[in-house]
C-alpha cells in the first residue's frame, strides 16, 4: 500500500522516535511510505500572528507539492503540522482573494484536492480493521489518552473527533489491550507554545496533566503530538519542581504502543530516546 508521508521538522529532530515508530509499524503492516519530495517547514510557529500570508504560503506549498507528486492524501503525524496544513486548506477554500495572494507567493498551482490525515485518522482508516489479528503482545495497562490542542482545535476547521471528549485514540488503545482511563485533562494545553519563553508555565500546565493522569491510575500517557511529548517527557525536572513530587509516569506515542503490541523491538520504536524511561513489561520484553 503506497501512502504519501509528510514528516515535518520535528520528526527529523526532537521527535525522531515518533518518525522511527511510524516507519516501523508501516513496514510491519505492509505500508509503503512515500515521503514528499522537496518539502519545507509548515510554519508551525507564532508566525501566523505576524504575517498571515506567509504563514499560509508555507503549508500551501506543501499541499501543492503533494498534488504535483500525484498524492490524493498525505499522512501528517505531527499534530502541529496537521493543524497548519488543515487551516491553510480551510482559509484558501473560503477566501478567493487570499488564495490568489498566497498562490502568487507559492508559485505553484493548487486545486485543493489532497486530503490531510493525522496519525489517528490514518490508523482508523488503514490499520484498525486488521489490527486484532496482528497483536502478539497486548498492551495490558491503564493509559491516559492525551489529545492536547492541535488535533482538535479549531474544531470548525478540523472537524476531527469530539471536541470535549475525543475517543479515537481511546478506541485504538482498547483494541491494543489497554484500558483508557476517564480523566479531566485529555484536551488541555500542555503549554508547548511557551516551552522556551515561559518554562514556569509549562511546568504548571504539563504538571497538572501528568498529576491527574497519575492520580487516576494511569501507567502511561499516550500522545500523538511531538510538542506534547517534548513537554511531558523532556520537561520533567521543571514539572517535578512545580508539583514538588517526582512524576515517573512514561509518555509514549500511539505508534510506539501499537508497535509494542504487534511485537516490534524497542530499538525499532525509538524507546531509548525518551528522557523518562519506559519501564513497562512490554518494553522490557522487546529490548533485542
Short names for language-model regions:
Residues 1-288:
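Iron-sulfur cluster-binding electron-transfer modules in prokaryotic oxidoreductases
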